[in-house]
Structures are given as C-alpha cells and as structure tokens.
Amino acid sequence: MSTTNAFPKTIYAIQHLAFEDLGSLEDVFYQLGFRVRYFEAGVDDLTPAFSHDGLTIILGGPIGVYETEDYPFLKDEIALLKQRLAADKPTLGICLGAQLIAHALGAKVYAGHQKEIGWGPLSLSLRANQVLSPLLNNVHVLHWHGDTFDLPENAVLLASSEIYTNQAFEVGNNILALQFHIETTEENFEKWLIGHTCELRNANISIPKLREQNLQYAQALEHAAFEVIQKFLKRIGYSG
C-alpha cells in the first residue's frame, strides 16, 4: 500500500456508543477523499470491518473488555481483532478500542485505581514524535476512562499522563492505540455530558467545569487531531 491509488479509500469505524463517533476525524477523512462506514458493535456483523485491508478504527464505550458474560459480542469482536492484528493490518483504537487492542495482544486490561475524566496534557516519548508530535506544546486531550491496561509485549509506549502511565502505544507501523480521545469536538461535547450523566454524578465530577474545559481546549485539539491522523495515514501507506 505505497501509493494513493492502492490504499483503500473506505474507513471502517466500529462504535460501541452512538454519540462516540469519529468526531473531527470524520471531517479529516472526507477532506482527504475517504468514505466512512460505521458498524455498531453488538448489532452489526463486524466481519467486514475487521477483514478488509484499509484502516479500521475501534472507538470508545462504557463497557469493559472483560465483561464478556454480560456482553457476549465482545468475544467475537476480540477474536476478529486478534486475526486482524496478527495480519498487521492498519488499526487505530481509541479508549475502549485501545483497551481491546491491548487485550487482543495478550496484555491485562483491568479497572484502574481512579477514573480519569477531564482535559489534560500528555507526556510524550521520543518515539511519539513520528505521529503524536502535534500533541506537544501543552495541547490538552480528553481523558474519559476508568479502566487501564498493561503494555503489550513488543509494544512501544508513546504517551503517559499524571494519573496513568500507559496512555498510548504502537506495535510496528500499522497499529496505534490511544487511551485518550482526540476525536471529540466542541460542538458534540454536550452529548457526552448527557450520555454519561450517571457516571459523572457517581464520580462527583463537575459538569460545568468540563464544559469550561471544553471551550478552552477543544479547538486546539481538533487542529492537532487533524495533523495526527494525517501523520498516521502517511505512515500506514496513504500518500495523498
């Protein structure tokens, strides 16, 4: 996949929650001439999303990768993901998607010592400069998770936060896992606050403060996310 014409021009996105979509990344893909096809985990057959040769993006959601008894579809999703990763096909995981990648690669995924919800900066490794360098200069990303993961074997750590060390990793050039969110938009954020109201209340997290942070940091993150996804596309073989 070394030329623009050879790289598949459909992005396959797997959702686990309706309002957690590709967000600002979807606009980037459309600007670059890609099509986007969504699949709903637990509803749709995910086989096409995992078997194709282009980029698959696994999005976030409130369930844990270990909750397979309550959500049996996770077993099939993980099995398909293992096959995809073994074939080294381009894959990006965000939040739950990153946890699924870690689990599929044999790492432990488990409930963390505290929830990390809100906007904050990252500490990036030197290796992160290849793809995540747009997140330097105090760009704040959106953290929204309670689970965490150990670093998979042969994975390279790319980013950490004050609360959790393992915030992003890569395996080779084609597999990228982000525990944090880069896709959220200023306009869509209210849906997150409504959809996650029980979680926010139970964690005693200030919704007005989250709104304030969104207004302060979201636009800069959108610009950085545009550059991050372009760098990742270039690395996995898209040269447009």
Language model region names:
Residues 22-24, 67-69, 102-104, 153, ...:
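Short glycine-/acidic-enriched loop or helix-start segments at secondary-structure transitions
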Residues 114-118:
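Short Pro/Gly-enriched coil loops immediately N-terminal to beta-strands
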Residues 11-29, 42:
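N-terminal beta1-alpha1 ligand-phosphate binding loop
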